[in-house]
């Protein structure tokens, strides 16, 4: 794909001022010449005799050691030379002079492994110099190169001030097997499985005409329910069915409206009574695991209760229209807001309340004006996430508090009735049952038991235990779409249905196109940028020529930790293609980016980039979500035309959020918690309610087994004809052409994202220049360098938190830390990063603890004065991407002593004392006493810190003292 076609131009001008730019025609010829010359040089290395490879090197014009083989005459034609190779040899011979004077940096040349040459006046050496690799110095300092390292710490390497500049691509230019690159996978097309049912409408489900009209005219939802709505609404709307409901449906199928519509309709008759207002108290409570999901439900509820209360307001003349009063006011309780303001709203009355568990329990215990004695509805949304985040104790306390308040209110109303006689007890003839108790207004609030609705996309054993504690005689409802648009309600009661539940448990929408890219750790950054550029380009063309809504161009990128989000957010906004390494404005740009709601990138023009993670304030979260969703603000009102945007986030945005028109989800890091369930929740942010979507997963070569043996084996895709299939038929669809996750070629991804002439390696040169732009930004100031180092260390710590079942695929010891550092635009060896990690920890500690931290740093004595440059050159040469970190004495191994001191200071400063260390030792002793330490005696530092942190937070299970940690802030998983 050419740059002129993708609509996203990259400025590949050299940082230093040079001569006039070369014409596009000459650039294309140069790219072809480089491609042909590289292939010819590769054949020369194979055909050259052994004695020719040890020719003494000669000094080149630029002072770079160049082997004599670089000046060899064109190779003679061999006997078995193919026609294609012959054409390449002839073309390379005729254009060798043009190739040698190419102004663009060639990342595959041998001298480029040390430092790239970008000066217009300098000549690039021939790629045939790679035949004498051993004779070349591993790292060469070029004084005249504008890409030379400067301004960074000198402890990383002796050869350059800024570190080691290594190439991204192998010398032969081939990244993967030709079978993957040339045979793209053809995925079978499916009809949407979570789209609204065509053969039914909301009116047939028993919904009030006011709500039917409001959904179609004001909320633009239409009149057709989804499969789960069609299955659940009749049970929730029927006045005689008071059973609790457990709703399970795939993500993006409309579960929020499934429980909000019955709540609003059940309260509409009360609006006909003129003596009832909002002071009646809270009648319905909805619990959500995160602040973002709670606010989203609140916003949907606000739109829902703003419906017209009579048909006359709809310009329809109907006799006998009942007059209703508007007192259904929703309320929101969540962390990050002022409790005094919330108490004022509760004192006035909030009939429908949306809250997070912790804040609701706080008000139940401390707010006396909080009236929940008449509560009729309790909804637990995303129940599996509530349990994973450790809210089980809060949920139990909430249910007990609601039961106690209900009994107190009912007893007080009974005693206030004229027919009440003191001394009576249940069973006596004069005893007034709960169904007959009325308040002073004559309302029988306690005639029906409180209904509990539990919603979840997955039903694991923990959710079933919670359902047993909170639900009474529950009914499990699943919406399954068939050819005839029929829905089925299933209750799991036997072994056969358990198998069916397992098949539906990990179901992805059929219209979601899932792909994965096997990415070497060096190429993670440029591959992410290529995916973003290619999708934005496709969405922009689709918006211009096909559909203005289908190509919205909104992308969500999931990462493993908050430091990684902050680094990529600042790097995309600060990297410039023509910037210098000593740009003094880099620190100011990073500081401005941290304060701004969004940033824009020169690499992805006219597309705002937002971020979202758990360490942001509530106001920053709200601003990011509103900006990404395209809600009209001062900035978005000025934007015209294409409304694409990018959201960089952690797993905090993976559950329940219905962000509008998200067309693509990219997972830079596989989920560290939850496994396949978390993966499905992430990809469920797109392809919602029948819309198309695509998802991309970046995996390292050693992580391919997780895709093949976990995702492919345990995930199903429900097609429109799978409702009538048995479980064995559904499982058999993963074979052959119905593979669920498509392997994609990294070469094609880079080609589409970076552009350039098809059939050449020009995209590799462009990707290298983009990588160098990020590296120049990192070494240009202290703040960018600090962000990159923190992101690298946090990523390694987060990688170590994968569950024991996934350690065979995600083993931190199998990481090539040197190549991984390249993904964070670092030129320093990870050993030196480990030594600098104490400074990172000190920058995040309070001022009162600086002295203690400095004393701890003085005790760290890593051997960082010398670095093994030969090991750097051999391991980081770019010729192979296998992991070498299993070898002892690897130069790219983290300084464990420095990291241990860093983590000790982090844990110690978390609670201001050394209590966490004692708790860590107690946790290890408790685990050893329970028999856990027999098989897992060698716990990682991350696991020990997680035990200590969870102990400090007071979140522990009751199984022999062994702890279960979820979303610990130290590890920045959420």
From Swiss-Prot:
What's an example Gene Ontology biological process for this entry?
Answer: rRNA processing
Query: According to its UniProt record, where is this protein located?
Result: Nucleus, Nucleolus
**Leader sequence residues:** none
Spell out the molecular function terms from Gene Ontology: ATP binding; ATP hydrolysis activity; RNA binding; RNA helicase activity
EC identifiers of the protein: 3.6.4.13
Chief location = nucleus
| UniProt keyword list | ATP-binding, Helicase, Hydrolase, Nucleotide-binding, Nucleus, Ribosome biogenesis, RNA-binding, rRNA processing
Residues covered by the Helicase C-terminal domain = 531-747
Biased composition range(s): Low complexity: 13-24, 67-85, 92-102, 118-133
Q: What is known of its domains?
A: The Q motif is unique to and characteristic of the DEAD box family of RNA helicases and controls ATP binding and hydrolysis.
Indicate the family of this protein: Belongs to the DEAD box helicase family. DDX31/DBP7 subfamily.
**UniProt name for this protein:** ATP-dependent RNA helicase DBP7
């Amino acid at each position: 794909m050419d740059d002129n076609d993708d609509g996203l131009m990259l400025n590949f001008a050299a940082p230093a001022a040079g001569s006039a730019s070369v014409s596009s025609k000459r650039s294309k010829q140069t790219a072809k010449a480089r491609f042909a010359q590289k292939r010819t040089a590769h054949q020369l290395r194979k055909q050259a005799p052994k004695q020719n490879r040890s020719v003494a090197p000669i000094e080149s014009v630029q002072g770079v050691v160049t082997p004599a083989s670089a000046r060899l005459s064109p190779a003679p034609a061999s006997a078995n030379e193919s026609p294609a190779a012959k054409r390449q040899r002839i073309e390379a011979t005729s254009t060798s002079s043009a190739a040698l004077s190419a102004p663009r940096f060639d990342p595959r040349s041998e001298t480029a492994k040390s430092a790239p040459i970008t000066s217009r006046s300098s000549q690039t050496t021939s790629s045939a110099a790679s035949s004498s690799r051993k004779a070349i110095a591993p790292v060469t300092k070029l004084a005249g190169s504008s890409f030379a390292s400067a301004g960074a710490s000198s402890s990383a390497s002796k050869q350059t001030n800024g570190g080691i500049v290594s190439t991204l691509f192998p010398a032969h230019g081939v990244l993967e097997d030709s079978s993957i690159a040339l045979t793209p996978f053809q995925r079978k097309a499916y009809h949407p499985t979570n789209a609204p049912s065509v053969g039914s409408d909301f009116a047939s489900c028993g919904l009030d005409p006011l709500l039917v009209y409001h959904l179609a005219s004001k909320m633009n939802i239409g009149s057709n329910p989804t499969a789960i709505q069609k299955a659940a609404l009749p049970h929730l709307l029927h006045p005689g069915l008071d059973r609790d409901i457990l709703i399970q449906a795939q993500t993006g199928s409309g579960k929020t409206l499934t429980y909000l519509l019955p709540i609003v309709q059940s309260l509409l008759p009360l609006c006909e009574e003129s003596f009832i207002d909002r002071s009646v108290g809270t009648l319905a409570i909805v619990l959500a695991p995160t602040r973002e999901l709670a606010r989203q439900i609140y916003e949907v509820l606000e739109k829902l209760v703003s419906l017209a209360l009579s048909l006359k307001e709809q310009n329809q003349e109907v006799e006998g229209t009942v007059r209703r009063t508007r007192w259904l006011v929703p309320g929101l309780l969540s962390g990050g807001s002022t409790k005094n303001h919330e108490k004022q709203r509760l004192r006035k009355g909030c009939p429908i309340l949306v809250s997070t568990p912790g804040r609701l329990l706080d008000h139940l215990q401390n707010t006396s004006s909080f009236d929940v004695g008449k509560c009729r509805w309790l909804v637990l949304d995303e129940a599996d996430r509530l349990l994973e985040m450790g809210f089980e104790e809060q949920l139990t306390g909430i249910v007990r508090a609601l039961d106690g308040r209900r009994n107190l209110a009912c007893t007080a109303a009974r005693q206030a009735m004229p027919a009440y006689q003191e001394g009576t007890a249940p069973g006596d003839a004069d005893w007034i049952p709960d169904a007959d108790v009325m308040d002073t207004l004559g309302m029988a609030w306690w005639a029906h038991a409180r209904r509990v609705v539990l919603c979840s996309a997955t039903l694991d054993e923990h959710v079933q235990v919670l359902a047993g504690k909170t639900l009474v005689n529950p009914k499990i409802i699943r919406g399954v779409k068939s050819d005839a648009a029929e829905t089925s309600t299933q209750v799991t009661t036997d072994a056969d249905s358990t198998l069916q539940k397992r098949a539906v448990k990990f179901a992805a929408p059929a219209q979601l196109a899932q792909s994965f890219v096997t990415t070497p750790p060096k190429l993670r950054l440029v591959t992410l940028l290529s995916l973003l550029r290619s999708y934005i380009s496709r969405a922009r063309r689709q918006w211009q020529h096909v559909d203005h809504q289908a190509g919205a161009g909104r992308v969500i990128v999931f990462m493993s930790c908050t430091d990684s989000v902050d680094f990529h957010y600042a790097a995309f906004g600060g990297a410039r293609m023509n910037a210098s390494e000593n740009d003094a404005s880099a620190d100011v740009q990073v500081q401005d980016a941290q304060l701004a709601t969004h940033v824009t990138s020169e690499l992805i023009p006219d597309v705002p980039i937002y971020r979202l993670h758990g360490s942001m304030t509530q106001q920053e979260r709200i601003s990011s979500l509103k900006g990404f969703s395209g809600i009209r603000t001062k900035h978005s009102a000025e934007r015209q035309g294409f409304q694409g945007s990018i959201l960089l986030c952690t797993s905090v945005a993976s559950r329940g959020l219905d962000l509008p028109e998200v067309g693509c989800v990219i997972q830079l890091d596989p989920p560290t918690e939850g496994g396949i369930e978390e993966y499905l929740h992430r990809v469920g942010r797109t392809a919602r309610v029948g819309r198309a979507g695509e998802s991309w997963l970046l995996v390292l070569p050693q992580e391919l087994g997780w895709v093949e043996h976990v995702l492919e084996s345990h995930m199903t895709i429900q097609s429109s004809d799978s409702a009538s299939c048995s479980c064995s038929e559904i499982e058999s669809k993963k074979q052959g052409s119905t593979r669920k996750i498509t392997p994609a070629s990294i070469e094609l991804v880079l080609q589409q994202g970076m552009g350039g002439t098809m059939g050449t390696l020009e995209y590799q040169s462009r990707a290298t220049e983009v990588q160098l732009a990020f590296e120049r930004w990192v070494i240009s100031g202290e703040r960018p360098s600090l962000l990159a180092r923190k992101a690298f260390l946090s990523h390694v710590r987060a990688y170590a938190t994968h569950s024991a079942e996934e350690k065979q695929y995600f083993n931190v010891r199998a990481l090539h830390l040197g190549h991984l550092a390249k993904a964070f635009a670092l030129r320093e060896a990870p050993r030196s990063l480990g030594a600098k990690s104490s400074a990172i920890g000190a920058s995040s500690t309070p001022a009162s603890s600086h002295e203690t931290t400095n004393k701890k740093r003085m005790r760290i004595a890593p051997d960082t004065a010398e670095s093994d440059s030969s090991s750097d050159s051999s391991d980081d040469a770019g010729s192979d991407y296998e992991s070498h970190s299993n070898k002892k004495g690897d130069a790219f191994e983290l300084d464990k002593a420095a990291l241990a001191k860093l983590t000790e200071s982090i844990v110690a400063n978390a609670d201001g004392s050394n209590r966490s260390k004692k708790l860590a030792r107690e946790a290890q002793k408790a685990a050893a006493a329970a028999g856990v330490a027999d098989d897992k005696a060698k716990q990682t530092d991350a696991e020990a810190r997680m035990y200590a942190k969870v102990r400090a937070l007071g979140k522990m299970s009751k199984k022999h003292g062994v702890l279960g940690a979820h979303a610990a802030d130290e590890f920045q998983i959420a």
